[in-house]
């Protein structure tokens, strides 16, 4: 049984649900004694904020042209820069390579000890 509802009524219901979630979450947090109850109030507030974002998305999309912004945000990549030389007398890239080799040799020695049938495995 489908009941027709106008877009204006639908937005009103969404806004009422958001307001109810905010009020309920605030009351639960305000009267809570335990941390678990306060967390439940936080869940109510989080759900209300999500509902508010869903409600406001069409307006934000039209106002800020999110179709243009969102692909740009999605293609952002973080490219870390090598750290500054700390006066050790060698470049940071060589230090990283030597550190990686040292770690690799440590892992290799540990794996050799764990192999069945080798002397290192019998000592453990």
Swiss-Prot record:
InterPro entries: Kinocilin. Its main location: membrane. The chain crosses the membrane at residues 13-33, 40-60. The keyword Heme does not apply. Residues 110-124 have a biased composition (Basic and acidic residues). It is found in: Membrane. This is Kinocilin. Residues 90-109 have a biased composition (Polar residues). Keywords: Membrane, Transmembrane, Transmembrane helix. Disulfide bonds: none annotated. GO terms for cellular component: apical plasma membrane; ciliary basal body; cuticular plate; kinocilium; neuronal cell body. It is a multi-pass membrane protein. May play a role in stabilizing dense microtubular networks or in vesicular trafficking. Residues 80-124 are annotated as: Disordered.
């Amino acid at each position: 049984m489908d009941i027709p509802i106008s877009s204006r009524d639908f937005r009103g219901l969404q806004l009422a649900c958001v307001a109810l979630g905010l009020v309920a979450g605030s009351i639960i947090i305000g009267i809570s004694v335990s941390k678990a109850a306060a967390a439940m109030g936080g869940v109510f507030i989080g759900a209300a904020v999500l509902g508010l974002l869903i409600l406001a998305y069409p307006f934000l999309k039209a106002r800020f042209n999110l179709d243009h912004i969102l692909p740009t945000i999605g293609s952002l990549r973080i490219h870390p820069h090598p750290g500054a030389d700390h006066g050790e007398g060698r470049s940071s890239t060589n230090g990283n390579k030597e550190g990686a080799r040292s770690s690799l040799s440590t892992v290799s020695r540990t794996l050799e000890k764990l192999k069945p049938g080798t002397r290192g495995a019998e000592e453990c």
